[in-house]
Amino acid sequence: MEKGAVTLEGIGGEQIPLERADVVIMNPPFTRQQRIPVSYKEILIKRFSAEVSYIHGQMGYYGYFIILANRFLKDGGRLALVLPASVLNADGLLKVRKFLADQYHIEHIITTWQRAAFSENAQFREILLIAKKKVNKLKDDVCTITELKILPHDLTEARNIAEKIAQISKVKKHGVVYDDKDIQISLFTMDEIRNSVDNLFKFLAFSDKRLVDIWQSITERLGNRLATFGKYLKDNGPLEGVALGQIVKGGGIGYFYIHRTKDRMLKKEDVWLLRETKEDGIDVEHKLLLMTVHIPWRALRCALRRFSGFSTLDISNELDYMVVDDFPDAKIFLKTLDKKLDPNLLSKWNAYTSRLLGNIFLVNHADISAPGTAILSYYSSKMALVPRSMWSMRISDLSAKIFTLWLNSSLNLLQLLLLRRETRGAYLWFVAGDIKKFLVLDVEKLSEDEIGNLLQIFDKVRGVSFPCVLEQLRGRFWARVEIDRAILKVLGFNEQETNQLLDYLYPALTKEIEQLKTLMQG
């Protein structure tokens, strides 16, 4: 390594010898892998050729820093790292998690419920991870999960908390071993950690640890009635919604939407309003220029501009339109954009959007605590396009209806919160790989009567306007209860079991979402 080095190739500066250390403390950059240039990744992989088996192409900078720290740490030494919580379940860090679980005794994972991060002005949730580099694995190695409900105000309080954690870590118990108004401490064996490297986030996904047990007991008891979503999606999703930037840099996709009503025209680029529906197409009007253009059906697709404010499961009759292909007045239409576009680009746009059509949609980057978030998954009887803030999937109409019920159920809400990529509190974020792993009702194993009962419930609630998710849970909104009861019945729960489970889930999930909302505000 060189003092004054300006490139990864080590150019310039005088040599500084680095010795192996007993302790390595780091707060590495949280830069996402998407922002690392491909050429830079190639150099990093070359630099870490000895550890290439731990490197993933979608690994952020902090993953490389963990590997770097290992190079300079003595056997028996300790790592102390400030990391984004996403390190616990991101696919790109799976190899690093396996490396830490195999080569280290992960002694402590510490987080806080008071605010998203320990660092000032940080937007993403953080954890503190302390691990000891070990040569031999011991059966009695324990990982202590500490969740601070209140952050220490000064050094004295911090020292007292550290002493309490150290003392409780020696207790020969399992699960939640200490819980008061300031702190919750849980103990898990390293074998449990190693067996859970796919999703270590589950150990701190909920303040109420019983919720994890409920989900695990359901999957163990009813695994034969559930299947992965990927079994039904196959190659038909999930696909991210449309983005004009995939075809034209800096383009505003709102210019391509035809809005059904004025109240949906919220942004500057939302300029086209549906004026009249005709046999051969639609007439649309520019809200500022007051000019009218006729667009034939062949150049249009049904589309959803944004999911916020849509509160029904079935959006078939609420969809807007999107221009996706060339038409006689296309040049006039494109002239109203804030930049010049070649009409020939519409053929590329058509090919791109055609691949993204779906009939069941899942929200992404959604604030589950927001007043405008009422539905998590939408159904459409017409193939449609959705924005980048949603996932699009294409399956049979029958399965789409049943999965829409499941994805909006309280059992699935429990699953979503457990598997979410932690970013900013109540925001739900998933990647395609996560969604394919979701457990859903195995439609192929349902009887005709069970399918008929579920479709009957779907028809009953498909047009109902749901309040926001929090209000649904707080007030036990009747349509949510109908969905939950129908699904639990299919899964084999009797009346008493159903009542007991829902009586616990509704207030518990409400509390968790409110807690996540507090994280964002803190």
Where are these regions (language model features)?
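Short, conserved secondary-structure transition motifs
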Residues: 1, 115-122, 481-494
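Flexible helix-coil linker/hinge segments at domain or subdomain boundaries
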Residues: 460-479, 483-486, 490
